[in-house]
């Protein structure tokens, strides 16, 4: 090793010794260990609303939305979707059953209700919901009431359920009326029949479901 290289190595070693000495004075003989910087305080996430609160909130707008109406005449005349929204599989099902549906075939009605399940979104608001094709022009639905919602929001709950059920079923099949019954503990607490004509051209955002139910002859028991 040349003299110049030796001097460089000694200078480097001397520098490291001095740095260790400084560290020893500052940290009491030991070098500090690396620690991750503490994470910045994050704002606490707002508490999620309880299930009951969510149901109460959505109950006030339950009737304002509904399924898109199935155009069975369109489905009969076309092999593929014309609306740009319906899936090929679903359209194929509609196309297959369109002729019998338009003829008022109750077996076709029943199969469509089972496959399409138009009331599937409402299961969290009731203990059970059934639907039945009574005739070519009439569907019937019965739901077993959610006890808590019935107790807290009786008329609003019943009317909201009734109107949403009617809207979804009228959108699903070309019937003229839907009869809805609400039961609790084996007793009928609500009964109403909505006709297509009564619901036609309504702005449901501004509709009072209780007033409409009474207009349609509803019985709150």
State each model region's role:
Residues 1-221:
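Long, charge-dense low-complexity segments
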């Amino acid at each position: 090793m040349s003299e110049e290289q030796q001097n460089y190595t000694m200078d480097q070693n001397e520098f490291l010794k001095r740095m260790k000495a400084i560290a020893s004075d500052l940290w009491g003989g030991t070098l500090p260990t690396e620690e991750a910087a503490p994470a910045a305080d994050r704002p606490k996430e707002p508490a999620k609303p309880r299930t009951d609160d969510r149901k109460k909130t959505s109950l006030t707008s339950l009737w304002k939305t509904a399924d898109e109406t199935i155009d069975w005449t369109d489905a009969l005349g076309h092999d593929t979707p014309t609306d740009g929204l319906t899936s090929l599989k679903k359209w194929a099902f509609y196309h297959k059953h369109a002729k019998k549906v338009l003829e008022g075939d109750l077996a076709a009605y029943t199969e469509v209700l089972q496959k399409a399940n138009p009331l599937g979104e409402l299961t969290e608001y009731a203990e059970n919901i059934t639907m039945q094709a009574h005739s070519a022009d009439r569907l019937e639905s019965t739901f077993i009431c959610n006890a808590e919602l019935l107790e807290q929001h009786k008329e609003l709950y019943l009317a909201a359920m009734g109107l949403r059920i009617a809207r979804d079923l009228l959108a699903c099949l070309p019937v003229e009326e839907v009869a809805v019954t609400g039961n609790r503990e084996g007793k009928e607490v609500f009964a109403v029949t909505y006709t297509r004509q009564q619901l036609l051209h309504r702005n449901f955002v501004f509709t009072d479901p209780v007033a409409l139910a009474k207009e349609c002859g509803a019985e709150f028991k």
